[in-house]
C-alpha cells in the first residue's frame, strides 16, 4: 500500500491510498481533496495513518507490537504537524541577551528601535553600516533601509549624546551606592581610511602608528571598574593635555560632583594643567615626570635606597606630595627596553645611518650627541645616567590619602586602557569610514553605549558566577535559535527559544526572573 497524489483538472489535488495487485493498481480509499500545499501535507499524514491501521487489521497475528507502533506513528505525525506550522526560525540568542542588558542599564528610556538595533549590531556583529543591514535581515528578519540609517546618523548626534551619558552616569552611580568617588581620564586616537584632512580629522601623533592617516582624539572618563561616564571628541592634532579639563569641568558641573579624585597619566599633564586642577579645587593623582624635576628633587630621589615595592614621599609644598616607588620588575623592564633601543642605535651607527636629523628626544635617540661638527655618536654617559632611574615611578597628588592607596588608585588607570581595547578590538570603533562630523559623532555615541552594555554584561556574568567572558558568551549565544509556530486555529504565534545541552552554562541569561533579581 502506498499514498498517491492525483491532480484534478480544477487544480485541486486528491490524496488516495492504493496498492498493486497482480501488477495492477487498485485505489482503496480517497482520503480527501486538498486546495493548497498545507492541506496536501495533512492529508498525506492521514493516509499514512490509514495504511498503518489497515495493515494491523489485515495481519493482526503479525502485529505483536501494534499499539506501540501506532503510538510511535501518532507521535511522528504530531511532530510533522507541529513542524509544518513553523513560521520562522531566528538566530537571536545575542539579541535576547543584549536587549535585556540594554534595558537593565536604562537605555530603553530612549524610545528608538533603530538606535537599539545599531548598538546591538555593534556588539554582536561589528562591521560597516551596509553590512549591518544584511546582518539584521539575515539574523532577525528585520528590514532596515541603509539610507534610513545614514539619515538617522545625521540627526542622532544632536540629541542622543547628552541622554546616553546621563543614563550611563546614573546607572554607574547606582552601582557605587550613589557616589562616584574616582574619575579616571585618558585619551586615544582613532584613524580614518582617508587621504585628506578637514576641520575635525587631522594628522597628528598617532597612538596606533598611523601618522599619515587623518585622525580624531577621543577622550574617555570612566569610574572605578571601568564603567564609561562621558566622552569627548577633538581634532586629531590637538594637544591631548588640553582635552581633560573641559571634560571634567562639564561633568562636575552637570552632576554636582563633590569629594572626588581625578586620576590621569603624566602624558596629559603639564604645570599649567596642574595649576588649573588646583584652581578648581579638584583633588588629583597623576603620573609624575620625575626626570623633569628640579636638581634638588632628582638628587633626593636617587639618594633613596631602592627596596622592592617600597615607596617614599617628598613634600613639595603647597599641599603637593611627590611619591616615588621602586619595583624590581620595573627595573628589569626598563633595562631590557633600553638595551633593545641601544642595539638598534648601534646597528644604525655601524651602517652610517645616523644623521643630525636623529638628534632629538624621541625614544632612545636621547642617547645620541654630536661628536664635533658633523659626526653623530652614541653617548654612553647618558646611558649610564639613565640606568640610575631604572625601576622608579613617580606619582604627584594633593590628596592626604595613604601612600598605598595613591599607588592603587593610579594603577587602576588600566580600566580606561581596557575600555579603549574593548572599543577597538571588540566593538571595532575604528577605522572609520564616515566623513561628516555628524556621522562621526553618531558613530562614537553608538560605540559608547555599546561599551557600557559590554561592561554591564561583564559585571552581570561575574555577579551570577558564570565563568565565561563576554566574548565567549556572545559567541555561544550566536548558536541559539528561537522558533515561531503559527497556531492553525487561532492564528496566534507561539515562540520558543531553543536551549541545547551546550547552552546550559548561560541558560539563566534567558530567564526573565534573573534580570529582575540581580
PLM region spans:
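Anion-binding and metal-coordination hotspots
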Residues: 2-4, 12-13, 24-25, 98-518
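Conserved glycine(s) in the ABC-transporter nucleotide-binding domain "signature"
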Residues: 1-113
Amino acid at each position: 500500500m502506498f499514498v498517491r497524489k492525483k491532480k484534478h483538472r480544477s487544480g485541486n489535488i486528491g490524496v488516495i491510498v492504493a496498492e498493486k495487485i497482480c501488477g495492477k493498481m487498485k485505489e482503496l480509499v480517497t482520503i480527501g481533496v486538498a486546495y493548497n500545499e498545507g492541506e496536501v501535507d495533512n492529508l498525506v499524514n492521514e493516509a499514512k495513518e490509514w495504511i498503518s491501521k489497515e495493515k494491523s487489521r489485515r495481519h493482526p497475528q503479525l502485529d505483536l507490537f501494534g499499539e506501540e507502533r501506532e503510538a510511535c506513528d501518532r507521535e511522528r505525525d504530531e511532530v510533522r504537524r507541529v513542524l509544518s506550522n513553523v513560521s520562522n526560525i531566528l538566530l537571536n540568542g545575542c539579541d535576547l541577551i543584549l536587549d535585556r542588558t540594554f534595558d537593565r542599564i536604562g537605555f530603553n528610556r530612549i524610545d528608538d528601535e533603530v538606535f537599539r538595533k545599531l548598538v546591538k549590531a555593534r556588539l554582536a556583529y561589528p562591521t560597516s553600516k551596509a553590512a549591518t543591514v544584511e546582518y539584521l535581515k539575515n539574523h532577525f528578519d528585520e528590514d532596515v533601509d541603509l539610507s534610513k540609517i545614514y539619515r538617522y546618523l545625521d540627526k542622532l548626534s544632536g540629541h542622543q549624546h547628552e541622554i546616553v551619558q546621563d543614563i550611563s552616569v546614573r546607572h554607574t552611580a547606582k552601582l557605587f551606592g550613589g557616589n562616584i568617588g574616582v574619575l579616571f581620564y585618558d585619551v586615544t586616537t582613532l584613524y580614518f581610511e582617508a587621504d585628506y584632512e578637514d576641520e575635525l580629522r587631522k594628522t597628528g601623533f598617532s597612538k596606533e602608528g598611523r601618522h599619515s592617516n587623518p585622525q580624531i582624539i577621543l577622550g574617555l572618563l570612566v569610574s572605578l571598574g571601568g564603567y564609561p561616564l562621558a566622552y569627548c571628541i577633538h581634532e586629531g592634532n590637538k594637544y591631548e593635555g588640553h582635552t581633560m579639563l573641559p571634560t571634567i569641568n562639564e561633568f562636575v558641573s552637570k552632576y554636582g560632583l563633590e569629594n572626588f579624585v581625578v586620576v590621569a597619566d603624566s602624558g596629559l599633564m603639564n604645570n599649567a594643567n596642574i595649576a588649573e586642577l588646583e584652581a578648581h579645587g579638584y583633588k588629583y593623582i597623576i603620573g609624575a615626570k620625575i626626570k623633569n624635576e628640579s636638581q634638588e628633587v632628582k638628587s633626593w630621589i636617587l639618594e633613596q635606597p631602592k627596596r622592592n615595592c617600597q615607596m617614599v614621599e617628598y613634600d613639595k609644598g603647597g599641599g603637593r606630595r611627590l611619591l616615588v616607588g621602586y619595583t624590581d620588575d620595573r627595573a628589569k623592564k626598563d633595562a631590557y627596553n633600553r638595551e633593545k633601543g641601544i642595539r638598534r642605535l648601534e646597528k644604525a651607527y655601524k651602517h652610517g645611518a645616523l644623521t643630525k636629523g636623529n638628534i632629538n628626544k624621541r625614544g632612545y635617540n636621547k642617547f645620541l650627541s654630536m661628536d664635533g661638527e658633523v659626526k653623530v655618536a652614541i653617548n654612553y654617559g647618558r646611558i649610564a645616567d639613565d640606568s640610575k632611574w631604572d625601576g622608579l615611578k613617580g606619582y604627584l597628588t594633593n590628596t592626604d590619602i595613604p601612600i598605598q592607596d595613591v599607588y592603587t588608585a593610579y594603577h587602576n588607570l588600566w580600566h580606561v586602557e581596557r575600555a579603549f581595547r574593548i572599543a577597538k578590538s571588540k566593538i571595532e570603533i575604528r577605522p572609520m569610514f564616515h566623513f561628516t562630523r555628524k556621522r562621526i559623532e553618531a558613530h562614537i555615541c553608538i560605540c559608547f553605549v555599546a561599551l557600557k552594555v559590554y561592561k554591564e554584561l561583564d559585571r552581570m556574568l561575574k555577579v551570577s558566577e558564570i565563568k565565561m567572558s563576554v566574548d565567549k558568551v556572545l559567541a555561544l549565544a550566536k548558536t541559539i535559535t528561537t522558533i515561531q509556530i503559527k497556531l492553525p486555529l487561532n492564528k496566534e504565534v507561539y515562540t520558543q527559544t531553543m536551549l541545547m545541552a551546550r547552552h546550559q552554562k548561560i541558560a539563566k541569561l534567558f530567564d526573565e526572573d534573573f534580570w529582575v533579581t540581580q
